[in-house]
Amino acid sequence: MAPQTISLLWAMVCVSVYTRANRVVAPIHEPQNWKPATVDDFTCRTGFNLDFDSKFIKTKALVLKRVGQAKVKGYLCMKNRWTTTCETNWLYSKSVSHHITHVAVSAEECYNKIRDDASGNLKIESYPNPQCAWSSTVSREEDFIHISTSDVGYDMYTDTVLSPSFPGGTCKLKTCCKTIYPNIVWVPETPAQTQVRDALFDETMVTVTVEAKKVVKDSWVTGATITPSVMEGSCKKTLGSKSGILLPNGQWFSIVETGQITIQPKGSVEEKETWVNLINDLNLSDCAETQEAKVPTAEFTVYKTESMVFNILNYHLCLETVAKARSGKNLTRLDLARLAPEIPGVAHVYQLTSDGVRVGSTRYEIIAWKPTMGLDKTLGLTIVPSGNRNSETIKWIEWTRTDDGLLNGPNGIFIADGKEIVHPNLKMVSFELETYLISEHSTQLVPHPVIHSISDEIYPENYTIGGKNSYIKIHTPTAYFWSGIHWIEGAVQKLFIVVVATALIGLFILVVWLCCGCCSKSRPVRNQKWE
């Protein structure tokens, strides 16, 4: 890896420090096929952002842009029947009465009223006038509909609208909802599902890796607003009437395209399959009711950029370790930690012994790093969605002792002083760099993103890992005695501009003066006689 690239990566890392929980990819059980490691056993497995050879699908999906209740615009719609009754006797004595009756109203009648009001076709409300007849009772009635705006809440988990006017306070989302009043219903202003989609969801592109034409537990999903996540531990959850997948990290997405989806290796079309068939192979269970979806925070962009930088940086550090092994140099525990994979799945595990390094194959998962000492040394707990199954304790039984007296576990993990389980690369893999950089490196960072004082070549100096005197110099700025004192720097810059401008003006005046002098000498004097 070029020194310039290393420096640039470290600069990006230092600028985007973001502390997360200690979640690492670790082996969940010990292999049964240990063997002495040879040079060919030291390999690097690329992370999701680097694995360009893997097959994947890109498709449109809905993702949450907000959680909790949304607002659905609508109307309360009421229908009344106005009746006029005219009663006469044989002497033609007339009696007229009026009364109003509440009657049931349909959604169609409500929408007709909404359209009429919008078009200005207003109907004047008044009692009808019946034609009275001798010695008879005649009635005439006319129906009038009233509408008034009424926005209601919406619960995306139950797909119901919420209002005190509804019986029980809720109504399953549909074209019309009854209220506690027999003659009043609620109708949405526009199709409710459209309002819900616009309020809760954004449409984006997602990428999902596939193996053997299937989405498997080791498949990864990522997108413009989806944190890279493994599919294992996901469950099915319907939000806003949209069937989707809740990832282990709490993010939710729903595929928009239900037809054929292209499977691509390196961007070329290979074969087509439907998303339904792909995802059904996972046999996902339904999520627990208590499991809630999350929306990426404002830190998401920083985290995703940082994770990509870390994947690239870790991959190249791993390549350096492989080159070190193939050149016959001794490997350290930190080297073994760099060889560990960054994504779940089956991969090599390395363990230091008194005779060298041994290697085996095992399964890796994302775990919460919570080491505890005891008869069974615990590394941590598996990360699973709450409600699906209990977290599993990850233990490492067989620890090997080396000549330095330390007990060694998987991938460079060791027990220090018989009291503490130490991950040599934890600060790197868990993105907790701030303390690591301060304690292990002396860093020089540009206080502002300026380039005028940075030399053209960016390179690290004395780049070593470990040791009290080791450090990484991010870049080599052109230093002046006023560097770091901003008001002096500004004054010097302004003074420099004034001096240059004055010099240019003076040069211009000098040129003009010389030109004028030359012209005056060459011009003949008036009335002068030439001999």
Swiss-Prot record:
* Membrane among keywords: yes
Keywords, A to Z, come to:
Clathrin-mediated endocytosis of virus by host, Disulfide bond, Fusion of virus membrane with host endosomal membrane, Fusion of virus membrane with host membrane, Glycoprotein, Host membrane, Host-virus interaction, Lipoprotein, Membrane, Palmitate, Signal, Transmembrane, Transmembrane helix, Viral attachment to host cell, Viral envelope protein, Viral penetration into host cytoplasm, Virion, Virus endocytosis by host, Virus entry into host cell
> How would you describe this protein's topology in the membrane?
Single-pass type I membrane protein
Cite a single GO BP annotation: virion attachment to host cell
KW Repeat (keyword) present: no
Which domain of life does the UniProt lineage start with? Viruses
Annotated Pfam families: Rhabdo_glycop_CD (PF24833), Rhabdo_glycop_FD (PF00974)
GO cellular component, alphabetical, reads:
host cell membrane; membrane; viral envelope; virion membrane
**Signal peptide boundaries:** 1-21
**Regions of this protein lying in the Virion surface compartment:** 22-492
**Subcellular location field:** Virion membrane; Host membrane
Record topological domains on the Intravirion side: 514-531
The family assignment reads: Belongs to the vesiculovirus glycoprotein family.
Assembly with partners or alone: Homotrimer.
What does it do? Attaches the virus to host receptors, inducing clathrin-dependent endocytosis of the virion.
Which protein are we looking at? Glycoprotein
| The species this protein was found in | Tupaia virus (isolate Tupaia/Thailand/-/1986)
Which gene is transcribed and translated to give this protein?
Answer: G
